[in-house]
Amino acid sequence: MGISRDNWHKRRKTGGKRKPYHKKRKYEPGRPAANTKIGPRRIHTVRVRGGNKKYRALRLDAGNFSWGSECCTRKTRIIDVVYNASNNELVRTKTLVKNCILLVDSTPFRQWFEAHYALPLGRKKGAKLTPEEEEILNKKRSKKTQKKYEERKKTAKISPLLEEQFQQGKLLACIASRPGQCGRADGYVLEGKELEFYLRKIKAKKGK
């Protein structure tokens, strides 16, 4: 007897029992949770109703995360799970689920920002640049190209909270996809009011 997602085994609202008028059906089984962890990619396919497929991610180590204010999406490494509004147990076991808050590697976003604006981001004062980074930031450009970069620099503003995270090399992000259903951990980088809210929550949790 498998587990099934049905409601005819429950009593009525009045308290009376229901007579089962059919057996358990193949279209109403309950399956074990994926409990996606951080690790080398491992995905199982599950055949579901209609011959369709679901992708159960058992382990994931990267995902596509978008930086909304800069309209930039990059594949980046998942480092750690830091907060989950629904269950602290899922933070302790580092389980990836939709809407959990995690730390992702900031390097792809920093590289994009520096190439796009020709400005350093999240660098410690007086830090040495590698020859490749030096070339990107201090490249000799034609007048027309230089003018384009000067125009871009006018809008290259980043909030102090994000700047601080770039210095640490880790960004707070939220998962928007469902890893146990589609086999991917994609999401967005936290910014603005949402970032402030979750920083407060994480700080309060650490203080306990």
From Swiss-Prot:
Coiled coil: none annotated. The keyword Glycoprotein does not apply. Keywords: Cytoplasm, Lipoprotein, Membrane, Nucleus, Ribonucleoprotein, Ribosomal protein. Residues 1-37 are annotated as: Disordered. GO terms for molecular function: structural constituent of ribosome. Its main location: cytoplasm. It comes from the Eukaryota. GO terms for biological process: maturation of SSU-rRNA from tricistronic rRNA transcript (SSU-rRNA, 5.8S rRNA, LSU-rRNA); ribosomal small subunit biogenesis; translation. It is a lipid-anchor. Component of the small ribosomal subunit. The ribosome is a large ribonucleoprotein complex responsible for the synthesis of proteins in the cell. Part of the small subunit (SSU) processome, first precursor of the small eukaryotic ribosomal subunit. During the assembly of the SSU processome in the nucleolus, many ribosome biogenesis factors, an RNA chaperone and ribosomal proteins associate with the nascent pre-rRNA and work in concert to generate RNA folding, modifications, rearrangements and cleavage as well as targeted degradation of pre-ribosomal RNA by the RNA exosome. This is Small ribosomal subunit protein eS8. The gene is rps8.
